[in-house]
Amino acid sequence: ASAFATVQYQDTGGWILSCGTWSILGSIEKGPVLTEQAFQGNYANEPAYDDSTMFVQNSVNLWIWEEFRRQLEDQGFNYTHEELNRLADKADAGIAVIDPTAPEFLLSKDILDSIRKYCEESGQQVPVNHGEAARIILESLVENYRQQFETHAEIKKATPSLLYLIGGGSRNPLLCQWTANALKTTVKAGPANATALGSSLIQLASLGEIGTGDFNDVVGASCAADIYTPD
């Protein structure tokens, strides 16, 4: 709820993807959505600020990316995020797709080996280097977003013209651009520190220091946003 508060008062009708260790994709509603399709889609209606409802799906997200990078670091490959992104960008697209929520990745002590085994067992091309594995991870995360996005669109019977991508993932330009491409939707990325900033906004509002009408101005003055349009 805190993270969503950083964007929920921007009057665009856009949907929100909170992109961190976990992903939370959804929209702000006036009340809970209680349809059979929402139930079958494993949606949650969570209280949001100002008596609104977050209608969302939760999923494992950047944990696999961070764990992959950490394990490579343990092996002596000290890639920065930018370096790993460059390797992923240079690798061929569409090598393979994994399910980043699968137990074999959540419990893996060797993400690279687990990706190779998954690809081999599913009859897909096996990555031969770090760049290919990195691309598979990012493309698979984006595919997960796309599936969630399309399910949300089916339930809402509408699609937004804008997706707010907030949280740590907003710092990854490759992930943001590929998300815009896959969803065929403009992505507004940032703030990266949405949870902390949103919490501060809510506390200040509770103390009467600001109103919800001030949230957008505070966020705009505190954080720059990047816009990604579909290629």
Regions of interest found by a model, annotated:
Residues 1-162, 171-195, 203-230:
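Active-site core segments that coordinate phosphate-bearing ligands/cofactors
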Residues 200:
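Catalytic-core signal marking the mid-to-C-terminal active-site face
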